[in-house]
Amino acid sequence: VRTRNDDGFRGYDTNCRFPPQEVVAVTVAVVQFGGSNCDRDAVRALSHLGVDAERVWHEDGLPEDTEGIVVPGGFSYGDYLRAGAMAAHSPIMNAVRDAAADGVPVLGVCNGAQIGCEAGLTPGAFTTNASARFQCEYVHLRIENADTPWTAAYDEGEIVSVPIAHGEGRFEIANDRYDDLVADDRVLFRYCDADGNVTDDANPNGSKGNVAGILGQRETVAVLMPHPERASLPDLNRSVDGRGILQVFG
């Protein structure tokens, strides 16, 4: 488990453990497309928080008792056309949009974020990294707005460490719409350095404004490129900083 000391370094505390919690009465659907590869990770991370999560094949539709939705990472439909474009037109995404309109929490992670943008759940788009390379590394994120369901476990300005793994993670949006996002406090996370400075060097993919995650029109809808489910398990992951994002489902 990563912990803070006085100078802000997150070291390892081998004496700290977070055993699985008692399962609560919440059913979270983790939508699985052909090419998804983070669905099992998401289910395990949520289950460790005591959340009743299950993988749902996209052709089967959402269970009637769905109280939360995760669209996980991967390479849905091989990223043909562009990342997330084909999955966004899957019939299950109509149900996801309807659920989002009803206030059901919806989280898109990595490829799920790309799908969410393509499906109109959030503005903007994710395109090829500025490096033109697949980026797989831990990054620092700065919490921009702590007054949301997804960031309530953090403090505004807090720095967390969460991994990325993407080739098309560069967030792009028209300047006027970006200004609206900022004015409406819909930017959740920005890439930063270990001291919280938002710089070009700390931007792994060239995202506009170093944006790593945003809200939809409703604060119950969020997308982000980093993987909170890969920063949630103390006996497996280098960081557990992603747990706070997933706690909205518990």
Language-model region placement:
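Short acidic/polar capping segments at secondary-structure boundaries
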Residues: 112-114, 121-122, 132-133, 145-148, ...
